[in-house]
């Protein structure tokens, strides 16, 4: 529902212009991986923060870097894992920079953003809901990975099923 022809992320990647977004989903559903893939698909300076280990000074430093990036025509993409762990004042620090386009924010959360992310930030971001992959989807991904590694014939279907079950 997020990827594929005429889906929001596909349009953003094709236009090389990401919108600020909040990725909401359970642990292990691919929020961080998706953010890294998006960063790799656009020409932006990518920075990743954990709301658990980062504070306002880290953000101020990044905003200064983003200003220097802007002067040379470089966009700045900021990924904040566990954005719901920032308090309201910390989340407020993003607002002027998201509004001005100085940064593009991708926040990841396992919590309902309607309750954990401040409304002004939500209104300037697109909320994308990620769902965990089911066993068949995981097996398909594993098969694809094994093909690219030329190891597909050495792994039994039972082993693939077992690996897929371990991911839950």
Language-model segment annotations:
Residues 1-7, 44-77:
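Short glycine-rich substrate-engagement loop in P-loop NTPases that contacts/grips substrate
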Residues 11-49, 64-67, 95-96, 100:
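Walker A/P-loop
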Residues 19, 71-77, 100-106, 126:
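Loop/turn-to-beta-strand initiation segments
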Residues 44-47, 118-132:
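A short helix-turn-beta junction within AAA+ P-loop NTPase domains corresponding to the substrate/partner-engaging
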Residues 49, 79, 104-110, 129:
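Structural recognition of the conserved hydrophobic beta-strand(s) that form the central parallel beta-sheet
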Residues 71, 127-168:
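Conserved C-terminal "switch" segment of AAA+ ATPases
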Residues 82-86, 90, 111:
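Conserved Walker B
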Residues 95-98, 112-126, 143:
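Short regulatory helix/loop adjacent to the ATP-binding pocket of P-loop NTPases
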